[in-house]
Regions:
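Enzymes that bind and transform nitrogen-containing heteroaromatic metabolites
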Residues: 1-141
């Protein structure tokens, strides 16, 4: 444990620890785990593993994604070094065009775009660029 955080060696170990911390039964049913939240915070390979699996310990599969979208005010290309997997969004009728290993998702809430007062994004040259951000909540269909 470091500063109140628990380090674990794998996604499975983290989900078992989340279940135990919530006091859910070891042999939990879907009703037992419905009230237990676990936040999976990347990197990109951890997101990819979590989204593609249907056998996550104590949780089964990821049902909700909360993500932050960013874009640079100046329009500069911000490359970054970690990417979350692409999510297939449903159309207004609730249909997805293609099958995705990460499932089909619908946006259930989205905040208005805001101008960050203190945050910035670095472009390829290392220049600080003002940014906008928005929060989205997605549910698996």
């Amino acid at each position: 444990e470091r500063d109140g955080a628990l380090w674990v060696p794998s996604l499975d170990a983290a989900l078992y620890a989340a279940r135990d911390a919530a006091g859910a039964p070891v042999e939990a049913t879907p009703a037992d785990t419905a009230a237990v939240d676990a936040w999976i915070l990347g990197g990109g390979s951890v997101y990819a593993e979590a989204l593609s699996r249907t056998d996550l310990p104590a949780f089964g599969r990821v049902e909700t994604v909360e993500r932050t979208l960013f874009y640079c005010q100046e329009g500069n290309e911000i490359t970054g070094d970690t990417r979350a997997p692409e999510l297939q969004l449903a159309d207004s009728a609730g249909n997805c065009e293609v099958s995705s290993p990460n499932g089909c998702w619908r946006v259930t809430s989205e905040s208005a775009w805001e101008n960050s007062e203190k945050g910035y994004l670095l472009d390829e040259s290392g220049t600080k660029n003002p940014m906008y951000f928005s929060f989205q909540r997605l549910e698996r269909l």
